[in-house]
Amino acid sequence: MYTLIKLTSEYTSRAISFTSRNFVASEPTSIALKLTTCDFTTSFQNIMKQCVDYGHSFAFVDADDNIKAQILNIPYDAYENMHYGNIRETDPMFDLFGNLDSYTPDDKCLYVFAIGSEVTGKGLATKLLKKTIEESSSHGFKYIYGDCTNIISQNMFEKHGFETVGSVKYKGYQYGITKPFDSINCTEYIKRMVKTI
């Protein structure tokens, strides 16, 4: 049995650990770059903390209060001004995501930074996305968007009314003289996906 909660400051360290662990194990760009949990945490701990602090993030916890699935959300204006821990291991990722910046929202927007689940077959990630959609509307957001890096999240977002507004193909993507994402075979593109509320 899993309980849906709104993430609060008492969960910050667990939320950061969960996302770092989940992404280096299953997120295509993190795997392609061979990121460690330390690399991921160093680069993204500030935004993960802010996602919890802003109060728009949710999780499912088990009976022992361990996070089993979560979604980290942040208002776009805060996301846009975020400072990251710059390490060379994540530079190609920032470069790739930067190529999606041709789309920026023109009204109050909530950004889905991360969604993940350690539990399969229970629909926990889908329930978290639905909760985000419901909550964003009640807080006056006009849009929700996320940068979806794998086919599973892309299909889930599309099923819930998100449209692709930008994409970059992994194969052949060049960072300097390297092609760091050529090893990604599970998904063809990274997609920026947007839902109008």
From Swiss-Prot:
Family annotation (SUPFAM superfamilies): Acyl-CoA N-acyltransferases (Nat)
Catalytic activity: spermine + acetyl-CoA = N(1)-acetylspermine + CoA + H(+); spermidine + acetyl-CoA = N(1)-acetylspermidine + CoA + H(+); spermidine + acetyl-CoA = N(8)-acetylspermidine + CoA + H(+); putrescine + acetyl-CoA = N-acetylputrescine + CoA + H(+)
MF terms (GO), sorted A to Z: N-acetyltransferase activity
The keyword Transferase belongs to this UniProt entry's keyword annotation: yes
Origin species: Paramecium bursaria Chlorella virus 1 (PBCV-1)
Transmembrane segments: none
Keyword Transferase: yes
Entry binding sites for acetyl-CoA: N22, I115, S117, G121, G123, A125, T126, T149, N150, K159
Role this protein plays: Acetylates polyamines such as spermine, spermidine, cadaverine, homospermidine and putrescine (the latter with low efficiency). May play a role in the regulation of polyamine catabolism in the host during viral replication.
Protein's recorded name: Viral polyamine acetyltransferase
